[in-house]
Structures are given as C-alpha cells and as structure tokens.
Amino acid sequence: MQTISLSTHLEASQQVAWDVISDHSLYGSFTGTSQVTLEKQGTPHTNGVGAIRVFHVGPIRIREEITTFEPPKQMAYRVLSLPLPLRNCRSDLLLVPCEDGGSCILHWDSWFELAIPFTGGVLRRVVAAQLNKIVAGIAVEVALRAGSAS
C-alpha cells in the first residue's frame, strides 16, 4: 500500500475551507480538469455520502464516490475508475481549526495499491505531484473566498 500525506495551512475559517473542499462544482477551477460533474447525488447533502463525482480531463474520466461527509471537518472518497494502474485508491480530507479561529489546517491522506509491480516510485511521484497541485489550488480558492467574505 502506498501512502501520500499532505498538510497545508489555509488562510480561512474551517467553514470557508469546508465550503470549498465539499463542493464538487468548484474542483474544475483548481484540479486542472476541464469540468467536474455530479453523476449521482449524495445523502443527505448533494455532495454527501454516496455522491459520485466525475472529473473530465479531455477524453479521460475519473470517477470518485464520497464515503465520509462530516461538515465542516471531514470528507473521504474512494476512486471508482482511474486511467492509471492503481487499485483501491482512497483519500481522507480533514480540516482542523487553528486557535485563531480565522484559519485552519487541511490534512490530506491518500492510499493506493499498485496494479503493476515495481511502479511504485514513478506512480507515487505522479500522484503526489497532482495532489500537491490540487492542495495549492484549494489554498488559493479558500483565500479568495475568505477575502471576499470580509
């Protein structure tokens, strides 16, 4: 099992950060995908448990199912389909408020198994680079929303 763990400080409250990470429609702006659609609504929230979101990257489709949805602190998902030789991909996102009340820490942990032996180093770097890009995009989007809320 491969593991990638990232943490970043977000310049916004836990609620503002939650509003960004839990809304599938915003992911297109910071994931490098052309569009993110909702294939199936979750319960009880549209983006909640059971929701299936689809990331469109040209002809490529990545499908994810939300498995945990606990506003405003935790969301988890598992990858249903991915054009990489990976299996059992899942991620957990946790927002921890800072003592100042105006910022929080995003912890993003991802796990996956290799479908092709001996590809761990390369695939781990590819996945880590993409997750770093997404987390950086989330930080920018959260800061913009925090600024407009002031």
Each predicted region: which residue ranges?
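A generic structural signal for beta-strand entry/edge sites
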Residues: 1-3, 72-74, 101-105
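Glycine-rich portal/gate segments that line the openings of hydrophobic small-molecule binding cavities
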Residues: 29, 38-83, 133, 137-150
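Hydrophobic ligand-binding cavity/cleft-lining segments
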Residues: 1-42, 150
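Beta-strand/loop substructures that line and gate deep hydrophobic ligand-binding cavities in soluble
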Residues: 81-133, 140, 149
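Short, surface-exposed coil-to-beta transition loops
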Residues: 3-5, 60-64, 87-91
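Short strand-connecting beta-turns/loops that link adjacent beta-strands
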Residues: 13, 60, 71-72, 98-101
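Generic structural detector for well-ordered beta-strands
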Residues: 7-11, 54-56, 65, 94
